[in-house]
Amino acid sequence: MKKVALSVVAALAVAASAAPGFAADMPMKAPAAAPPPPPPYALDIAVGGIVQTDYLFRGISQSDKGPSGGAYFEPDLKTPIGTFYAGIAGYSISWPSGPGYGFTDPAAEIDIYGGWRNSWGPFSLDIGIIEYYYPSESWNGVTSSSDFYEIYGKVGYDFGNGFSIGGNIYYTPDLLHYSETFSGLGLPSSKPDAIYYSGTAAYAFPQKFWDISTKISGELGYWDISTSDFLLAGATANPSYTYWNVGISFAYKELTLDLRYYGTDQSAQDCANFLLVGLGNQSNSWCDDEFVAALKFDTSVGIGH
């Protein structure tokens, strides 16, 4: 009996001494590989389009209170110091061209822009320049050019709970190339500069319904326009004005439906002063408060990621 017990103990001892060697011979599972770091440079191309019941630029109709369509193309180069971008966008417009209005009746609005943007945690910054080009303008008696550019800066802060705020500033040294209009009217040649600044706020609801995300947003701004030449040209009031909008948007994949109400503090007379329309055409609705529905499509593709 003792011999049997000793034999069992010896067998267990041999098995125990062999266990580490046996475990060492088992194949070991390799640790999961860490995901590769993002490339230091990456190119994205964003494209999109829009159809809307009216095209408003800071509260003023650009499509004669009628529907408008547009599209854009924007390559973005992501680098270690931020994203550099350039783009082109086009919109169908309809400036009233009857006698005395003073408009040059361009075929479209083409926006050519470029800049740099970056973010640091919740804070974002975007600076750039945009050219507003109006092709095929007609001579209106004093000018055939309304092209102008703006330099801009935008800041934003995301609180991380769906709520975000922002600030924008745009500057142009020659609004709508009015310097040529003033010169054509025999006024001292000068460039009417203008600064537009605004604040924005948005809230994105955390819940989705049928995979549709919802956001409410608004903007309040002021366009500060130099006045001396406007008054010499026959304007009866300061063309500067306050602008605002508030709305709700519903996004599903690449599609967004935006329902928005726009307004300014301009009367028909104030609007005529800003647009420099003839004295016989000062009753207009281009600056009236208005509800606009817009359907947008936005997508992007990465190259070399």
Region roles according to the model:
Residues 34-44, 78-85, 119-124, 159-165, ...:
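Short loop/turn motifs that connect adjacent beta-strands in outer-membrane beta-barrel proteins
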Residues 43-49, 83-88, 112, 125-128, ...:
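Transmembrane beta-strands of outer-membrane beta-barrel proteins
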Residues 51-57, 90-94, 118, 129-136, ...:
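Transmembrane beta-strands of outer-membrane beta-barrel pores
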Residues 283-305:
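Outer-membrane beta-barrel "beta-signal"
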